Structures are given as C-alpha cells and as structure tokens.
Regions:
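C-terminal motif of bacterial Sec signal peptides marking the signal peptidase cleavage site
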Residues: 18-20
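Compact alpha-helical subdomains of small soluble proteins
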Residues: 62-116
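Bacterial signal peptide processing site
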Residues: 22-25
C-alpha cells in the first residue's frame, strides 16, 4: 500500500466513523401532524365555549384555553420534534404561540356570534 493510500485511509476512517454520529431528524408523516392539529383545534374550540366568562379579556380566556389543551399541544410538539427532540424548545414556543393566537381569535369570534 502506498503512502498516499495510507494517508487517505487514515483521513477517511475518522470521517466515516463520525458519519454514524450524525443527527437524523425524520419528519413525522403529514397525516399524523394534520390529525394532531385537528385534535388540538377541537380542544381549543370546546374550551373556548366552556371557559369564556364574557367578562375577562379575550387574551386571558385564550391563555386558559391553551392551558386546558396542553396535552394536545404536547402531542403535537412531540410528533414534530421527533424521537430525538430536535429543536423541541423552539417548536414548543411556536406551537404555544400559534395556539394562543388561535384561541384568542376563537374567543373574539365566539363572543361576536353570541351578539348576533
């Protein structure tokens, strides 16, 4: 074996070994995410009607609604983050904010529909 081949081999062995350590973030099946979002959205809708006291501001009720749907949000976060938890904190913050926005808008729409 020539010196060049030995040198190339000594460089490739650590590289190939490190490739086994690469993080693989596999995306969940799209239908699973849709199903989990639908479950979360249904939870938000149920709890808007159940928790709205018609006195508190919409954002306060929205926060209570999101808290009531924490299990649905966590299931969605876990599915998107995958088994390795890749970017779980960031995904959790985004889903929490999305849920809060949706819940607050649902409170506003719910109140408007009661008035008409």
């Amino acid at each position: 074996m020539s010196q060049a081949a030995k040198r190339l081999g000594s460089l490739l062995i650590p590289f190939v070994t490190l490739c086994g350590c690469a993080v693989v973030n596999s995306a969940p099946p799209p239908q699973e995410v849709v199903q989990l979002r639908n479950a979360r959205d249904a939870c938000l809708a149920r709890n808007v009607a159940a928790l709205d006291d018609y006195r508190s501001d919409a954002a306060t009720i929205g926060m209570a609604v999101v808290a009531a749907c924490r299990y649905e949000n966590q299931a969605l976060v876990s599915a998107i983050a995958g088994p390795d938890g890749f970017r779980q904190g960031e995904i959790s913050r985004q889903i929490e904010q999305n849920s809060l926005d949706a819940a607050t808008q649902s409170v506003v729409a719910h109140r408007a529909s009661r008035r008409s």
